[in-house]
Amino acid sequence: MICDDVMDEKCRMLDCHVSQVYEWLYYEIRGCALDPSRMTWEEKKAYLLEHWGTRYENAANEAREALIASYGDAGKNARYAETFELSPYGRKVSVEEFRELMRP
C-alpha cells in the first residue's frame, strides 16, 4: 500500500510514543536520549523519517513490482509503502480480493 500521502500522519503517531522513539531508539543509536520537548515539529519529523521512514522506503523498493501491478504509474513513483502478506490462517482470499481490501 502506498504511504506517500500519509507519512506526516505516521510521523505524528510515532511522535506520540516518546519513550520508544526519542529515548530508547536514540539511546540505542547514539548512547543518550533525545529531549523532544526542545525540538520543533520539523526536527522531529526529519528524525522520524530518517530512523523510521527508511523501513517504508525499503518496503516500496522491495515491493516495486507489486506496487506497479496494483497502482500503475503511481506504484512506479511511490517513495513510501507498507507491505502486507496473505496469511495461511483464517479465511483464504484471492489476490484480487486482497488488493481490493487494501485500496484506499
How should each PLM-predicted stretch be described?
Residues 1-104:
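C-terminal accessory domains and tails appended to enzymatic cores
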